[in-house]
Every structure is written in C-alpha cells, then in structure tokens.
C-alpha cells in the first residue's frame, strides 16, 4: 500500500507535528523490532527450536511491512534519519550516503570515544570497526548515485 497525504498543504501541515514525530518513532520501533526478531530467530535456530525461529522470522516480516507503511507517509516530508528527500532511487541513494557518512564521521567515532573513556575498550573497537564499514557503505551509495547521472 502506498500512502499519500490528502488535502491541500497536507505535506506542510505534517512536517514537525506530533504526528510526524509519532511516525518517526513508530518507524524506529518497528525497524528495531524487525532486527531484534531476526536476531532472536538466529538464537532459536542455534538452540534447536526451528518452529520458534520461524515464528520470529514471520513476525519480523510483519514488522518490516509496518515500517514500510510508516515510510510511505514519511517520504513525503523527508528521510526520518537525515531529513533529506526520499522516494525515488536517486534521492534514496543520496539520503543513504548522507546517513552512512554521519555514522562513520560523527556517530561511531563519538561512541567509540565515550566507550573508551568509560573503560569499554572492546566496545570502542566494535564501534571503530563499524565506522569503517559505514565508510564503505557511504562510498558504495555515492558511487551508485553518480552512475545514475
């Protein structure tokens, strides 16, 4: 289902409202539930509970659908992570590159610094590893964006 905001000025009316905030929060919650359930499914598989793993996987698929529904509304006011325009592939690539760039330039280095200051060197190293991965992702999205023209 593709959701569209109805009415004159609906886009301007949604931006920065409590409903806009609620959509972003709901999108984050559904997205996190999806990833948690996939992790739980992996654990259930390892522990020998394939039926439970299937339950988690099926539910994760449902949560993905919910998150996509929220994005159908959110795309009309911008990417919930970057605020940039999303919807068409070219815009999606730019928003994805911007998000990954923020993660490798700012977020993960800051997280690593804090973890190290608090004595969690192993977690700091994990964050530093992720920063490298995010830099690679940003480069791939940027390259793909450039090939679109």
Report each predicted region and the residues it spans:
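Non-heme di-metal
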Residues: 2-149
């Amino acid at each position: 289902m593709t959701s569209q905001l109805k009415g004159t000025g609906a886009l301007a009316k949604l931006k920065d409202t409590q409903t806009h905030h609620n959509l972003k929060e709901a999108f984050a919650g559904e997205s996190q539930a999806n990833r948690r359930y996939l992790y739980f499914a992996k654990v259930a598989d390892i522990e020998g509970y394939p039926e439970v793993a299937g339950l988690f996987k099926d539910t994760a698929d449902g949560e993905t659908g919910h998150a996509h529904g929220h994005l159908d509304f959110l795309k009309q006011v911008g990417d919930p992570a970057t605020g940039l325009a999303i919807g068409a592939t070219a815009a999606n690539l730019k928003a994805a590159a911007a998000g990954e760039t923020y993660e490798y330039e700012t977020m993960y280095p800051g997280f690593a610094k804090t973890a190290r200051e608090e004595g969690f060197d192993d977690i700091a190293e994990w964050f530093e590893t992720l920063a490298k991965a995010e830099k690679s992702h940003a480069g791939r999205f940027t390259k793909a964006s450039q090939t679109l023209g």
